[in-house]
Amino acid sequence: MAAPAILNGGDATERETRMAHSAMTLVQVINGGYHVVTKVALNVGVNQLVFCVFRDLLALSILAPLAFFRERTIRPPMNRSIFFSLFFLGLAGIFGNQLLFLMGLSYTNPTYAAAIQPSIPVFTFLLAVLMGTEKVNLLKVEGQTKVGGTLVCVSGAIAMALFRGPALFGGKDAADSVKSVIIDRSQPELNGWLVSSFLGLGFDQWHIGVLCLIGNCMCMAAFLAVQAPVLKKYPAYLSVAAYSYFFGASIMITTAILFVREPKDWSLTQSEVLAVIFAGVFASALNYGLLTWSNKILGAALVSLYNPLQPATSAFLSTIFLGSPIYLGSVLGGILIICGLYMVTWASYREQQTTSAGNEIASSSDVRISEPFIYRDETGK
């Protein structure tokens, strides 16, 4: 089903809506390129924590001045609730999201890392139900479709985790020949302890990477689920992104100081510096700024809907630049994830359109059709 692209009234114009859709397309294209760039950096042997620290500091140095000068007149006062919400956004959306992604990517490949990202919208829906911000009526078709789509999507994620299958395209994964080098030489004690713990339980490195990527998706889902109501109370989107990066970078720096033992790990080669610049400027500052603004305009339902663009972009780029193969398990699991995703979003939009039609009759035609499905107050506005 095609997602509604126009908001009838509300606080966003049709031009802003079109710009937000274009922005989210750009975000996912950049994310696909980021998967390839970071895989190359990991293969060279850059320390994951050090990479994240430099990336976050660079992004914060861009977002903080922009937020300070552009939103000084519209930034609401800070309170305890907003403070802790922003801290959580930094913990989940910056620290957990980035670190788990890099750990997962180092043990899999860019195609696989991108193929599992479409599970983010369904994880967002599950968290919204647990938080009580999304209701499911199992007596209606929409509610049944939501539950069915969630199960289909989770089944796809499980299939990707348990079934790798033969390579459909490409040859031997370039990452296989360097994994041991990456693990032995480059990664901090935090990573080594985590990996050794899972290896002791019978997991291999591929499945450890898959678990890290699932954790990465859940962190991003939590980030979107919490960010939507925060933007209602604190509509300065650049400030929300900057504060999130401030808290996330602070946690990342503290973790790096504790677990990065080798001074040489803090020195970067020229190619690693270029990877950090791409990650900090484009995949962090630009992407998170656009994502936060689009979340304010479109809502998390539509923002999450753009994640399925990542697998195609990443697969295309990684096959060209890395020679990474595309596995049967990734294809089958990705198909299930995307099918489940569209089942959930179709049911959500059906419910929203029904609610909007009722509100138009009861009040006026100035009603938001594309209301975020992870946030709903008592009045339904």
UniProtKB/Swiss-Prot annotation:
Localization per Swiss-Prot or TrEMBL: Membrane
Keywords linked to the UniProt accession: Membrane, Repeat, Transmembrane, Transmembrane helix
Protein topology in the membrane: Multi-pass membrane protein
Chain segments annotated as transmembrane: 26-46, 49-69, 82-102, 112-132, 151-171, 206-226, 240-260, 273-293, 297-317, 320-340
Family in the record: Belongs to the drug/metabolite transporter (DMT) superfamily. Plant drug/metabolite exporter (P-DME) (TC 2.A.7.4) family.
Name of this chain's protein: WAT1-related protein At5g45370
The EamA domain, residue ranges: 31-143, 225-345
GO cellular component: membrane
Record's keyword annotation contains NAD: no
InterPro entries listed in its UniProt record: EamA_dom, WAT1-related
GO MF terms held by the record: transmembrane transporter activity
Keyword Repeat belongs to the record: yes
